[in-house]
Amino acid sequence: MTDPMFSPGQCVIYGANGVCTVDGVREMQLPYDDEAQSYYVLKPASKPGSTIYVPMGNETLVGRLRPLLDKAGLDDVLQRVKGREMPWPEDRTARHQEFNALLARRDQEEMLLMLRCIYARRRSLQKPRKHLPGMDDDIMHSCEKLLTQEFSLCLQIPPEEVGEYLHNALDGDPC
């Protein structure tokens, strides 16, 4: 069995599943496996009762696992984001592809920049009483949910306080 990088009880981020708790490592042979192998057993926070098995020998899938940020790590990310902006991609198809690729990478810095970009666009549309296109709104909500879930655990604050923390940390800039 490979030495695990993550230990039972540790919170990790796993791709689109967001925050998961490492339930342990289990040696097992699934129907499509030629032989038994070691799997990380993950419990997604957003889907109680679900279990995810990540083969420890699959570098691509294990590469999608990363430890939850701590407060110092989050503050470092916020410092790098402060004062930066992402330009609004005007082409709807290109924007959809770019934003979805960005969400798939789960890079907090990129996600915060994307949120700021979407928020700025939403504010600019409110004056002529227009709204964000549905796909942009959906991406915004997905991004907010993922970041709130992670940052709430990292900061040990209720999810509803994350927005205010980010707003203050970015000197009043909407994140």
Which functions belong to the PLM regions below?
Residues M1-M5:
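Short, surface-exposed secondary-structure edge patches
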Residues Q29-Y39:
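Short, solvent-exposed secondary-structure boundary/capping segments
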Residues V41-G57:
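A short macromolecule-binding patch
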Residues G57-C175:
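Charge/polar-rich, low-complexity and marginally structured segments
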